[in-house]
Amino acid sequence: MKAGLLRTQFSYQNTVVREKMKEKTKESVSAVVPIMLIVLLLGFTMAPLSPSILVEFIVGAVLVIIGMVFFSLGAELSMTPMGERVGGSMLRTKKLWMIIAIGFILGVIITVSEPDLQVLAGQVAAVPNMVLILSVAVGVGVFLVVALLRILIGIPLAPLLLVFYAIVFALAMFVPKGFLAVAFDSGGVTTGPMTVPFIMALGVGISSIRNDKHAGNDSFGLVSLCSIGPILAVLILGMVYSTEGNFTTTAITEVSDSVELGKLFLYEIPEYLKEIALSLLPIVVFFGVFQIFAPKMNKKSLMKICVGLVYTYIGLVLFLTGANVGFIPAGNYLGSVLASLSFKWIIVPIGMIIGYFIVKAEPAVYVLMHQVEELTSGSISGKSMQISLSVGVAVSVGLSMIRVLTGVSILYFLIPGYGIALILTLFVPKIFTAIAFDSGGVASGPMTATFLLPLAQGACLAVGGNIVTDAFGVVAMVAMTPLITLQILGVIYRIKDSRRADVPQTVTPVVDMFAELSDDAIIEL
């Protein structure tokens, strides 16, 4: 009888995993296929692609889809429960020094583990790689501590953002132009697929221990504060190091047959196997040590996390291989061809269309959307968030292409953009502010770094611009505009909620995604 019960339980778990896999596959296909169709349409019309680049892109897209499926499922099974457990246990200790120490160490570890940071460090020739990586990691560690203390003390997020961004822009006035775009890019790059699931779950774990009505609001906001640390770190480095250094253009590898194509991808896979293993190892070691001192998990939960880590590992290896080998050359080539046309302005609307769809292919976006839906009981739907993010990224890519064509300083876009975003914090519910500033770091992930940035770099070379000052900054722009669009979503929510309050009690109002909860208590955990 016991054996039969175990078989039934095992069968049920397999069914759940299969259903989850189907759901993740559907999400991944719907996210990547539109990008494939856009690139193919351009390749067969105004921006002809060589057969080599085209086939590399298609194979890369398939790997990206498979990688997204495994990563999304793996993050849900491992990163999220690990983060929630660590966060809850930290608060239960009731020892401030321990919370500060663990928060700082954790911030440094997960930042050094972020694959995108390695890419950024390699592109900043003026600063030694290890110096940049450690500086950014310390920045994230410090601001993760600030974010944790904010949750514990109950400090509103908006005033902190106002103060820290005022410091950021004050420092920016004294930094050479060559460091500005890279500094703001670093804020988006470091909150990538490795960092976001863990940090967000950490916030959920800590806020869940609190019993007050604002605990749910405070589940968000950690990613937004952690994004500030890297910006400040690179700005400070800009005051120490010179801006001298050469930028290396992307090499496009031509393949003549299917054997060479296979070798091209297989040659890169061992590198990413090693890179992702080194990225995951510090987190696994930290959690293992944590398990020794914290109350033990049951074997079933621990096994689930181990399986999730394997899925995460496989997913990130496949995703980064496909994105780096297949997407970077295609993005770079498309940018150079479109910007070389007599009507080069066409790259602005085309960039906006690509930006609208490409954010859906960011792995961490789905982690954020699912967590928002779960914690708000569906009051803020994933679909409304996705549309807001897509519109924001579309606008940011359009503005980035205008920068590439005109050479206008990034500060002329960032200062008004962040100014508008910070002003909006005064008029929207607190949870929308926290989610909006979190989403900026989430939207600017590996797809931005491996397709949108090469697109801008290719266009910049074609028009004879400065790569460092004009092409870099795309990540920063992508991280900025969702702050505005998602808070506009909050304004819409507030208007709809006030209209609902004006409806007489005898009339049953139509309930939509923006009007399911009161304005003062959007979340009750």
Where does each model-flagged region fall?
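Transmembrane helix-loop junctions in multi-pass membrane proteins
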Residues: 41-55, 75-84, 109-124, 143-154, ...
